[in-house]
Amino acid sequence: SNGGILNLAGAQTSNSEVFSGGTENISSGGNAQNFDVSGGTLNVLSGGNAQSFTVSGGSLNVLSGGTAEFFTLSSGAAAGVAAGATVHDLTVSNGATLSLLGTVTSSVFIAGGATLNVSAGGAINGSLDSSGFPTVNVVGAVNVSAGATVSDLAVDGSGALNLLAGASAHDINVNSGGQFNLAGSTTSNINIRQGGLETVSSGGAANGATVFGGGELDVLFGGSANATMVN
């Protein structure tokens, strides 16, 4: 309820709901699952775990040592993941925003209209599924700042991966309709497939890119591309 607080430590809860003005704090040994945050605030502290939940119009804060998994950020939701925190198996829906200083691993979907901002020290460490495809898929926008890294990621549909000066990326697939914008940063092992576009602007360096039929790599003034293969 409005102004109410639930503190969970060393215990487990399920099927709860945090409404606007309400706060749930999950600390060491606490485990919350199968619940909704509807306009309220969820704080996952060191040693706490939140799983199988939805944030709708509210906020999620995962602090150092905290873990959040198997969740969805719906329209209007905002989430912050601090350095030392871990999140995985998540969907960021249209109109939601995730700010990342910690680490995201595997099974991530950034929907059209959603935004993921990766700041210094943050990392998207994707993986490959049993068929060899990346488990991190971007249809919205991912902005990667200096000191941040992303790997094993696919940019699909109308998605955009924007790599700013001082950021790094490797093992990226740019698929049909996807855009990879590279400025002042370095990449390796980039696959640009039919309908995909990579643009390298001043200070950017694309190393080891492969351009497949129908794909496009544009190197602008001040940018560079090394060891490029065009199929």
What kind of region is each of these model predictions?
Residues N231:
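Active-site region of the double-stranded beta-helix
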Residues N2-G4, A11-S16, S20-E24, S28-Q33, ...:
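The right-handed parallel beta-helix/beta-solenoid scaffold, focusing on the short coil/turn
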